[in-house]
Swiss-Prot record:
The keyword Methyltransferase does not apply. Keywords: Flavoprotein, FMN, NAD, NADP, Oxidoreductase. Disruption phenotype: Cells lacking this gene show a white phenotype, and produce 2-methyl-3-n-amyl-pyrrole (MAP) and 4-hydroxy-2,2'-bipyrrole-5-methanol (HBM). Its EC number is 1.-.-.-. This is Probable NAD(P)H nitroreductase PigM. InterPro entries: Nitroreductase-like (IPR000415). Belongs to the nitroreductase family. It comes from Serratia sp. (strain ATCC 39006) (Prodigiosinella confusarubida).
Length: 359
């Protein structure tokens, strides 16, 4: 790694940063780098971004923020810190470009820090099973809060029996909204991989949600929750049953955290993602995990009820339970780095004296 060129270091960093978490594991990021100008950009890949609910744009921006936090930190530790600036997706129409970047002056690589980040990113998985009852202590809380100093992001940490029952009550009442919006559920269903013997590059298998499941359960879920059979699922009260089961898990906590923004701009959501990426790896270094409860922030009614009931600083853009995991999570499918990075090389054409771009 010490003698890597920037281009090689970028490939290596993307190969690790691609393990960043994202909603439905849709991996909505893309990177382009121009070798001649030594400039690059990170964009939302609109072909991959979730669109089922307007609120999912928040999650796409935050997911890209997590990815860039991992990418830029790995490059810094490999000796290539980045200069970057916010450009903004909506100002660029369909391009989805979020930030532009360029390598700044090279520095001495920190191989120990690099390997620590590689290990933590590789070991980090979303854990949706029960956690140990271990309570977050004051020192740990201070470390988590410190991550958000001098940032537009506010972090609230909540715990206690009353909070656990409040969050479980909200989950039981609102989690069935995952199935209520036909377009949103159709999109979710699209990312479920039912054949565990077939390799995939995105999405998730049922065992990521429920742990090991039988072939019979997979077939039942595939049919009963098919978007075209939503009437059957409702008649069998399956959404309510799923919500009740999730609430029984959520009530165990043992604690919860929320991120909110005073000004909910695209740039601040991206920064919130970067900070969340740091927080997730800090928890990983403790042997702890996060379980996002996205349904409580994706729907306006649930989001307002959560903020009021749990007395959050503001409307949450992210909410999760967290704690010391009893067992590590399971890796999810991933795209190869070659599917994320595109490059432009410039070569001189002696016939016409013009630059020739080579994808």
């Amino acid at each position: 790694m010490v003698n890597d060129t920037f281009e090689q270091a970028l490939q290596n960093a993307i190969n690790i940063a691609r393990l960043a978490p994202s909603s439905h594991n849709c991996q909505p990021w893309s990177v382009h780098y121009d070798a001649a100008t030594r400039c690059g950009e990170v964009s939302i890949d609109r072909q991959r971004a979730l669109k089922g609910l307007p609120s999912l744009e928040r999650e796409m921006l935050m997911s890209c923020g997590i990815f860039f936090e991992y990418l830029s930190t790995l490059l810094k530790h490999s000796g290539y810190p980045l200069d970057w600036q916010w450009v903004g997706a909506r100002q660029n129409g369909s391009s989805g470009m979020l930030i532009s970047f360029a390598p700044s002056a090279p520095c001495v690589a920190d191989l120990v820090a690099y390997q620590q980040w590689v290990q933590r990113i590789s070991d980090r998985h979303t854990v949706r099973t029960a956690y140990q009852p271990t309570q977050v202590n004051e020192q740990q809380q201070a470390q988590l809060y410190a991550l958000f100093d001098r940032s537009p992001v506010t972090c609230d940490i909540k715990y206690g029996e009353a909070t656990r029952h409040d969050v479980a009550f909200l989950t039981a009442n609102y989690a069935s909204l995952d199935f209520a919006d036909q377009q949103a559920w159709r999109e979710t269903y699209h990312y479920i991989r039912f054949n565990e013997q077939q390799a995939a590059e995105d999405g998730f298998y049922l065992h990521h949600l429920f742990g090991p499941v039988s072939c019979g359960f997979r077939w039942f879920f595939r049919i009963a929750f098919h978007p075209r059979l939503s009437w059957l699922a409702k008649r069998l009260r399956l959404p309510a049953s799923m919500a009740k089961g999730l609430a029984e898990l959520v009530v165990e906590g043992p604690q919860y955290l929320a991120l909110s923004l005073e000004h909910e701009s695209d740039e601040n959501l991206f920064i919130a993602g970067m900070k969340l990426g740091q927080l997730w790896l800090m928890l990983q270094s403790w042997g702890w995990s996060l379980h996002p409860l996205s349904v409580l922030v994706q729907h306006a009614t649930a989001r307002c009820a959560l903020a009021d009931t749990v007395r959050l600083t503001g409307l949450p853009v992210f909410f999760a339970r967290f704690g010391q995991h009893r067992q590590s999570g399971i890796p999810t499918p991933r795209r190869a780095w070659q599917r994320i990075l595109t490059t432009t090389q410039h070569s001189f054409s002696p016939e016409n004296g013009a630059d020739v771009k080579q994808p």
